Amino acid sequence: MEIWHVSDARLRRTRDFGVTRLEDFCFQFNYIQPRVGYCRVPLKAWCSNQGKFAAQFTLKSCEKSGQEKVITSFTAYDKTVKKAVSKLVEEAVDFIIWRATYLERNV
């Protein structure tokens, strides 16, 4: 098995497949504008059995000092770009809602 991970160098950015919904949630809860990317998974990679495509997104907040703070990162795999990105968006939105509830914010 080849050691492989999603990196910014390989990612193509997209705003399709529900990403605008994620943008709305990020704006609503004061997170940095999301940058969702996707790439093809190499056949010999450890995660190739998860899907042909990987979608990636890092959730960041903006501190009062203006510095970005990484909250968490998401990676989703599936057979098509659309399915991988859609799955990623659903997972990220669910997490944002859960975190808002956990932090006792109004949803």
Swiss-Prot record:
Name a Pfam family for this protein: Corona_NS12-7
InterPro entries in alphabetical order: Corona_NS2
Similarity section? Belongs to the coronaviruses ns12.7 protein family.
Query: Superkingdom of the source?
Result: Viruses
Q: What is this protein called?
A: Non-structural protein of 12.7 kDa
